[in-house]
């Protein structure tokens, strides 16, 4: 289980696209608001409704999602 210190807030700055077999996941770019990676913009996959400006809590700020492939 993750410690409280591992969870960091991040602000959604851009919606990249939908992914997953049925489009149930949104790929977003987020700006980390706290911790050692503060200010860094990373790409993450998010379940559920999300819009630009939302604050989400992410466990690992060092991990990034793979870029969406165009088919």
From Swiss-Prot:
Q: Which InterPro entries match?
A: NA-bd_OB-fold (IPR012340), Ribosomal_eS28 (IPR000289), Ribosomal_eS28_CS (IPR028626)
* Cross-referenced Gene3D superfamilies: Nucleic acid-binding proteins
Tell me any Pfam family this protein matches: Ribosomal_S28e
**Which cellular components does GO assign to this protein?**
cytosolic small ribosomal subunit
Q: Name one GO biological process term.
A: ribosomal small subunit assembly
Protein keywords: Ribonucleoprotein, Ribosomal protein
Family from the record: Belongs to the eukaryotic ribosomal protein eS28 family.
Q: What name does this protein carry? A: Small ribosomal subunit protein eS28
* Organism (species): Archaeoglobus fulgidus (strain ATCC 49558 / DSM 4304 / JCM 9628 / NBRC 100126 / VC-16)
């Amino acid at each position: 289980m993750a410690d409280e210190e591992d969870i960091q807030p991040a602000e959604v700055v851009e919606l990249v696209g939908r992914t997953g077999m049925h489009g149930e996941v949104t790929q977003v770019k987020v700006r980390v608001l706290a911790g050692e990676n503060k200010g860094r913009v990373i790409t993450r996959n998010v379940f559920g409704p999300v819009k630009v400006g939302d604050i989400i809590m992410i466990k690992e700020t060092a991990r990034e999602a793979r870029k969406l492939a165009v088919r």
